[in-house]
């Protein structure tokens, strides 16, 4: 079998490539990246004969249509703006796929994918991704699911790569429409830095203040898990949160152009370019990823609570920034192998909780050092 890894030499997805080389059984793994030198260097560094590098331009839709049919699975690690064209191309040519993020319009291709007897799974990272498996695990233990509370701490700097800066700024942008929580049968919009509460994450992250974040679990789980309430809250390191808050308070998310020394540009564009260039926005004392889920429901009519959380090796063992990136990249590798190994029976465009068995997903995570722990109690 052949796997195609889009953006496979990027900041996040290079860890997917490494994981595929170590754990997967593919006959060939092609690292497709716009930066061919980075892809070549990664392939040489890993030193696995199954790996090869190939130039790939995500702006060239025609090249996707020509390239994808030669593979058994397309693994998309590109920035989220390419989610929709990659999904569309996979479905047009009938090749299974998955990606690390989610774009709302992807779900519109569900029926077409079913007609091709194929599956595409958006959002197979940490959150969404591991969190979906956690929620499914808890839901499987309950007769009724009343409330799913997802909390994450993405401990990385705001701008280690352009795509990650886009994600950071989008999650706190005042015009982001998908910052929702679900309650009483309705999706309710929340502004940036609303819904504040304290969550105690495993060390080295510890207790952090989280707020509502726009994530797809809120959209999918009322339907897939029958949850009456769903929310996603998250945070970045304190110094990153200060940047997001400062930009909001001072109107720096504005897209209205201003004139600075004869140059017309919006405050947002100025800040984006500035944050990409300042060295401090690529630094953080702790690289880590914390996930904590509290799921409330009923068993035999009695109220219960299931708390699940993840733990992983510290940055000293996992190589600095890899302690963050692996939490996103490893699930993408696992998800791909489960599709091609025949462990995913779902068809269409489906979220992770509808595609993957949580127990099996956790087994594979544990092999790599990411351990999901659980406490179930009657209330």
PLM feature spans:
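N-terminal Rossmann NAD(P)H-binding glycine-rich loop of SDR-like oxidoreductase domains
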Residues: 4-19
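N-terminal Rossmann-like NAD(P) cofactor-binding module of classical short-chain dehydrogenase/reductase
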Residues: 68-77, 97-99
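Rossmann-fold cofactor-recognition segment
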Residues: 46-60
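Helix N-cap at the beta1-alpha1 junction of Rossmann-like dinucleotide-binding domains, i.e.
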Residues: 10, 34-37
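C-terminal catalytic/substrate-binding lobe primarily of soluble NAD(P)-dependent oxidoreductases
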Residues: 141-379
């Amino acid at each position: 079998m052949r796997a195609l890894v889009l953006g496979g030499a990027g900041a996040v997805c290079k860890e997917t490539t490494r994981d595929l080389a170590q754990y997967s059984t593919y006959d060939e793994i092609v690292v497709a990246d716009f930066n061919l030198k980075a892809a070549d260097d990664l392939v040489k560094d890993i030193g696995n004969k199954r790996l090869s590098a190939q130039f790939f331009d995500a702006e060239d839709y025609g090249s996707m249509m020509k390239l994808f049919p030669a593979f058994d699975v397309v693994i998309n690690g590109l920035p989220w703006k390419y989610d929709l064209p990659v999904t569309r191309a996979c479905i047009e040519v009938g090749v299974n796929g998955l990606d690390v993020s989610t774009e709302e319009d992807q779900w519109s291709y569900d029926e077409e994918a079913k007609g091709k007897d194929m599956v595409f799974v958006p959002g197979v990272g940490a959150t969404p991704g591991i969190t979906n498996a956690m929620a499914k695990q808890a839901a499987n233990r309950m007769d009724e699911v009343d409330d799913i509370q997802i909390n994450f701490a993405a401990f990385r700097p705001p701008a280690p790569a352009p795509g990650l800066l886009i994600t950071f700024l989008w999650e706190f942008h005042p015009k982001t429409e998908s910052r929702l929580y679900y309650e009483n049968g309705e999706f309710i919009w929340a502004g940036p830095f609303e819904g504040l509460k304290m969550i105690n994450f495993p060390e080295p992250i510890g207790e952090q203040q989280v707020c509502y974040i726009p994530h797809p679990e809120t959209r999918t789980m009322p339907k897939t898990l029958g949850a009456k309430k769903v929310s996603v809250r998250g945070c970045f390191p304190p110094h990153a949160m200060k940047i997001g808050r400062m930009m909001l308070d001072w109107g720096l998310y504005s897209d209205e152009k201003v004139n600075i020394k004869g140059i017309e540009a919006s405050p947002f564009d100025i800040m984006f370019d500035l944050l990409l260039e300042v060295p401090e926005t690529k630094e953080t004392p702790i690289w880590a990823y914390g996930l904590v889920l509290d799921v409330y429901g009923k068993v035999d009519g009695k109220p219960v609570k299931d708390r699940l959380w993840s733990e992983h090796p510290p940055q000293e063992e996992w190589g600095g920034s890899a302690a963050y990136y692996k939490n996103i990249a490893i699930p993408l590798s696992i998800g791909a192998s489960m599709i091609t190994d025949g462990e995913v029976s779902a068809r269409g465009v489906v979220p992770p909780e509808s595609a993957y068995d949580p127990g099996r997903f956790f087994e594979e995570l544990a092999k790599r050092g990411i351990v999901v722990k659980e406490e179930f109690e009657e209330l």
